[in-house]
Swiss-Prot record:
The protein's enzyme class: ligase
The species this protein was found in: Streptococcus pneumoniae (strain 70585)
Primary localization class, coarse: cytoplasm
EC number(s) reported in the record: 6.1.1.21
Assigned keywords, A-Z: Aminoacyl-tRNA synthetase, ATP-binding, Cytoplasm, Ligase, Nucleotide-binding, Protein biosynthesis
GO BP terms, alphabetized: histidyl-tRNA aminoacylation
Family statement drawn from the similarity comment of this UniProt entry: Belongs to the class-II aminoacyl-tRNA synthetase family.
Protein name per Swiss-Prot or TrEMBL: Histidine--tRNA ligase
InterPro entries the record matches: aa-tRNA-synth_II, aa-tRNA-synth_II/BPL/LPL, Anticodon-bd, Anticodon-bd_dom_sf, His-tRNA-ligase, HisRS-like_core, HisRS/HisZ, HisRS_anticodon
The keyword Cytoplasm is annotated on this UniProt entry: yes
Name of the encoding gene: hisS
Catalyzed reactions: tRNA(His) + L-histidine + ATP = L-histidyl-tRNA(His) + AMP + diphosphate + H(+)
Amino acid sequence: MKLQKPKGTQDILPAESAKWQYVEGFAREIFKRYNYAEVRTPIFEHYEVISRSVGDTTDIVTKEMYDFYDKGDRHITLRPEGTAPVVRSYVENKLFAPEVQKPSKFYYMGPMFRYERPQAGRLRQFHQIGVECFGSSNPATDVETIVMAAHFLKEIGIQGVKLHLNTLGNPESRAAYRQALIDYLTPLKETLSKDSQRRLEENPLRVLDSKEKEDKVAVENAPSILDFLDEESQTHFDAVRQMLENLGVDYIIDTNMVRGLDYYNHTIFEFITEIEGNDLTVCAGGRYDGLVAYFGGPETAGFGFGLGVERLLLILEKQGVALPIENALDVYIAVLGDGANVKALELVQALRQQGFKAERDYLNRKLKAQFKSADVFAAKTLITLGESEVESRQVTVKNNQTREEVQVSLETISQNFSEIFEKLGFYTQ
């Protein structure tokens, strides 16, 4: 049997992992400006953590979860999304305690798992970056979080992004709308897809979100959630819209957007961009004021979003956005002869300890091959070290771009290479 990676997974090789590191580092920098701190949760959880919070009737739970019984007969699932594990952690670690500053702001990044048909930008093991904010029901929190997502997408270079906005109201408004939707869809049941016929019984709002052609036709004239908002829900949504407008953020009201998870209420949103004629959601989230209490904590408001890293990178690639990845070596040492081997090791280590990104040849190759390696690594400077240089303790350092050279001592390189680096036209941080 030829050993290969499982279907729906990928190896992220060095040429690509640099892009991942850039995106993750960029997200950390943006989130830090908004006072978010990182939280890391296990990649597997008790099955009930996901099934009861995400919703027993959602596609994630009924079709897509990787779940199993471990050797202790505990029902375990690989996490399919990030919010439920973070809420579980928030409650379990009593981060709702009075001494913890509110609102509490967390971000996470890491692998998630869903058993679905692999396609471009969607894998069975995928990676998500997300944020969760606990303790504020102020609509300004909704807006701040949405704007933070927009800030990230704009600064990283995603183009043509449109904000789609909707509300699911409070539980009372949602219940009234749910019944109106059932009344509207029941006479049309036979025209719906099989999945939507099931959803009509279990979670009728999910019919609005269906991508099937027959379902899209059926919901064209469906009642709007906006007609069923009570005063509290209307006031909250109006405040969100007004604040977005005050900040100059354009949005589209999308009453068919419901999100695929059951825990949302009030504001929900998606950032969508068009790629090759298809609308792709790059980031999505919303408010979930009942989830902390559902996990056994006190009544606590919550708001958050998630974005898929694979999809984000796919969109950046399709839009021709080149991430500013710095892979260049500062120094490459070409080694000539066995007599230079030990000194080359000492020298490259001294350079690294001074903070330079340095590499040397280990394969005793001809100089031409070593110089080619220096070019492949985009080395800024090149040192050729042979037995004669070791004996004289003098070496030539070359700017590998302009070919300018300086003659220096090995001691200077070992102790103060930054002076030479700057003399050759480069700047140290």
